[in-house]
Amino acid sequence: MSHRDTLFSAPIARLGDWTFDERVAEVFPDMIQRSVPGYSNIISMIGMLAERFVQPNTQVYDLGCSLGAATLSVRRNIRHEHCRIIAVDNSPAMIERCRRHIDAYKAPTPVEVVEGDIRDITIENASMVVLNFTLQFLEPAERQALLDKIYLGLNPGGALVLSEKFSFEDAKVGELLFNMHHDFKRANGYSELEISQKRSMLENVMLTDSVETHKSRLRKAGFEHSELWFQCFNFGSLVALKAGVAA
């Protein structure tokens, strides 16, 4: 059962850096729905992409799976046999709940839930990889290497879904979309104190990139095609395709 996010409703004397701990995991579904515009749309459409891209006898990776929402969306939409989903997160609290969540829904496609660092996971025989609001928590210098590894592990015709919070090279646009996101959180019941305290905790651990920077990295990794397929304010998702025809 998800609880309402009230973690930052009272003043916190010493704000540390953000961590996906037990307290966050407990309220995460409520938190992300009220904080990330378009999140539920992205989750459902990841399932639509899975229906199109997942191939028989291949693997799907959900890197930074949190509670498994994207994993479940993918699994509901796989139409082939002998597929496997590998869901990875480095938060013990998230992984514990993810396992329970996935076990509650029965489906023919097996899911392996792995507690570990996504940088250490071997990607192989993949028809689809999902990075759903995950890359932004890696050090910027480490992001290219992960994308390179994903490209190499994808089969021809495979797809990467990359969802992120964006920064903008046009400062005026960036300010507008930042303020729209602020209004979105306020409309969803967050107070100014809650918004401010959460932002202070995230600012050192969630470092955002522009869409142009993401596309540049994807090209460098080898992806022949990439495009923004969803955006709401300063949040969105890209799909990157590896050339070739799926076997």
Swiss-Prot record:
Pfam families linked: Methyltransf_25
Keywords assigned by UniProt, alphabetized: S-adenosyl-L-methionine, Transferase
Residues where S-adenosyl-L-methionine binds: Y39, G64, C65, S66, D89, N90, D117, I118, N132, R199
Reactions catalysed: prephenate + S-adenosyl-L-methionine = carboxy-S-adenosyl-L-methionine + 3-phenylpyruvate + H2O
EC id: 2.1.3.-
Enzyme class: transferase
A GO term, aspect molecular function: S-adenosyl-L-methionine binding
Record InterPro entries: CmoA, Methyltransf_25, SAM-dependent_MTases_sf
Cross-referenced PANTHER family: CARBOXY-S-ADENOSYL-L-METHIONINE SYNTHASE, TRANS-ACONITATE 2-METHYLTRANSFERASE-RELATED
Function: Catalyzes the conversion of S-adenosyl-L-methionine (SAM) to carboxy-S-adenosyl-L-methionine (Cx-SAM).
Family affiliation: Belongs to the class I-like SAM-binding methyltransferase superfamily. Cx-SAM synthase family.
Quaternary structure (record): Homodimer.
Protein name per Swiss-Prot or TrEMBL: Carboxy-S-adenosyl-L-methionine synthase
Gene that this polypeptide is encoded by: cmoA
